[in-house]
From Swiss-Prot:
Main localization, broad class: periplasm
Cofactor: how and how many bound: Binds 1 Ca(2+) ion per monomer.
Any Pfam family matching the protein: Cytochrom_C552
Residues binding substrate: 251, 301
Associated pathway: Nitrogen metabolism; nitrate reduction (assimilation)
Protein's UniProt name: Cytochrome c-552
Length: 525
């Protein structure tokens, strides 16, 4: 039983570390409290789920939105350049945001944690909006399909990438859009995140220079309905946050209608525990882990959810206020900057933070960096324990463990990694809600300790000497090999795909008039 003793000591140590970090973050998170905005109550309402009696589950086939020939969407961003030069030119500057981090190469633990899932091959931090189509084409996760029916991913993987998506849903209906493989949309989804994703570009208000904000993706409107909101009648604060919720949210692919429909799991709430409860009740899993056999969940990018739990969300400060702040051109005309500044504290302080905060830029930069370091420290501790839990589960299976013996330990792994992923996939959670991030990670540490304690008992029962020997995953190359991923083969196939298939997609899209020029090919730095 030595394994149980070791793991229980570890549990106490890691939980203490998480609590210390949590206390520090909570002390620093008060910087904006004195400047609470008048929209506090409205923002609070946005966080609340609809009454239980109003809640429902994923839509049935009959409830999916049909073809809508009356909904006209001009997806080509370039066509708005002449009428809206300031907004368009600032949006085009997202092309300057070429840098991203190759996350799984920087942190090979992820390769193990995502074993059996495409994220183990490649996962990168985000860059400029203009690269959304380019990056989903180039990433190893989407494979190298040779025709419209090939490849590993469904059509739904295009859903956040640009305004061609609502155009296609209007033309094909939801069932038609969400059916089939990702490659089906290769010559159709060609305009990256842009104008018609957020604006009703055909309306008179838009032509008159008003924002005319709109959500044109039916699954997003259904999700807002679950929290008691109707986009069209919502106030400006809710709408400004709601358009970002087109994409910056947690979602899953529901297959009950025969397609891969995008659904937001908000039926019990939008916090990590409520979403987990929903997934558990419907028996959903994103995949089965390749070595531990745990039924895993993959958080997407729950920025909207985590923002709503933080100081800014609670006080009605929206994504647009910080990342797309008002600015002036050389003639003094005020407009919304569409460059989408990733780090406004460093890169746009006077137009954002300084409008509410009395602290200096240096002070706030140090505060945010400390939050990030605190979250990162405990997150890596959780990753270390998750990696060990997956290998320990594999060892238990290899030594004759049964499904009945393993089910509780595997469920604990599922819940622990879900919490890690919820915090990790929301790239700015250290800024949006650092105290919430640390609470989530601390609860993940508790659950992985529970998993490892259960596994220690199972391993001892089957005569396994503990601690077990863990493989060397100190580099991405070593981790890929341990997890059975032939990364060079994947890369060569993708290179051929980029060279041969993508030019044909671009050629077809241009011939149809869907784009004027092909999506950018600037490589990431």
């Amino acid at each position: 039983m030595n394994g149980v003793i070791i793991v229980n000591i570890l549990r106490k140590t890691l939980s203490s570390l998480a609590i210390v970090g949590l206390g520090f973050a909570m002390a620093n998170s008060a910087v904006a409290e004195e400047k609470a905005m008048a929209t506090h109550q409205q923002a609070q309402q946005l966080q609340q789920p609809a009454p239980e009696t109003a809640a429902k589950r994923a839509p049935t086939k009959e409830e999916l939105t049909p073809v809508n020939p009356n909904l006209k969407i001009e997806a080509a961003n370039e066509k708005f350049a002449a009428d809206f030069p300031r907004q368009y030119n600032s949006w085009a500057k997202t092309a300057e945001q070429t840098e991203f981090h190759k996350e799984v190469e920087d942190d090979p633990r992820m390769i193990v944690m995502w074993g059996g899932y495409a994220f183990a091959k490649e996962f990168n931090s985000p860059r400029g909006h203009i690269y959304a189509v380019t990056d989903v084409r180039n990433i190893l996760r989407t494979g190298s399909p040779k025709d419209a029916n090939g490849g590993p991913q469904p059509m739904a993987c295009w859903t956040c990438k640009g305004p061609d998506v609502p155009r296609l849903i209007a033309e094909w209906g939801e069932e038609g859009y969400f059916s089939g493989k990702w490659a089906k949309g290769g010559a159709e989804v060609v305009n990256s995140i842009g104008c018609a994703d957020c604006h009703d570009t055909q309306s008179q208000d838009f032509k008159d220079g008003k924002p005319a904000l709109r959500v044109a993706r039916p699954h997003v409107l259904r999700a807002l309905d679950t929290v008691g909101k109707t986009f069209a009648t919502s106030d400006r604060t809710d709408q400004r946050a709601g358009v970002c919720a087109n994409c910056h949210v947690e979602y899953y692919f529901d297959k009950s209608t025969g397609a891969n429909n995008v659904v937001f799991p908000w039926y019990k709430g939008r916090d990590v525990d409520s979403i987990e409860k929903y997934y558990d009740e419907i028996g959903f899993k994103d995949w089965e882990h390749s070595i531990s056999k745990a039924p895993m969940l993959k958080a997407q990018h729950p920025d909207f959810e985590t923002w709503s739990m933080g100081t800014h969300g609670k006080n009605g400060v929206t994504c647009v206020d910080c990342h797309m702040a008002k600015t002036q051109d050389k003639d003094g005309k005020v407009y919304t900057d569409h460059q989408v500044v990733g780090n406004p504290v460093k890169d746009n302080f006077q137009n954002t933070c300084a409008r509410c905060h009395d602290q200096s830029q240096d002070t706030l930069i140090k505060t945010v960096e400390q939050h990030k370091a605190d979250v990162r420290e405990v997150m890596l501790k959780l990753e270390d324990q998750l990696v060990k839990s997956h290998f320990e589960a594999k060892t238990a299976w290899d030594n004759g463990a049964t499904q009945e013996e393993m089910k509780d330990a595997l469920q604990a792994i599922r819940h622990a990694q879900w919490r890690w992923d919820f915090a990790a996939a929301s790239h700015g959670m250290h800024m949006h809600a650092p105290d919430v991030a640390l609470k989530i990670i601390a609860s993940g540490l508790d659950r992985v300790a529970d998993a490892r304690a259960k596994l220690a008992v199972i391993l001892a029962k089957h005569g396994v000497q503990q601690p077990i020997q863990y493989p060397d995953i100190s580099t991405a190359e070593k981790a890929w090999k341990v997890m059975g991923i032939d990364i060079e083969k994947e890369r060569k196939e993708k290179e051929e795909f980029i060279k041969t298939v993508i030019p044909e997609w671009n050629k077809e899209a241009i011939s149809k008039g869907l784009i004027l020029t092909a999506p950018p090919t600037t490589p990431a730095k």
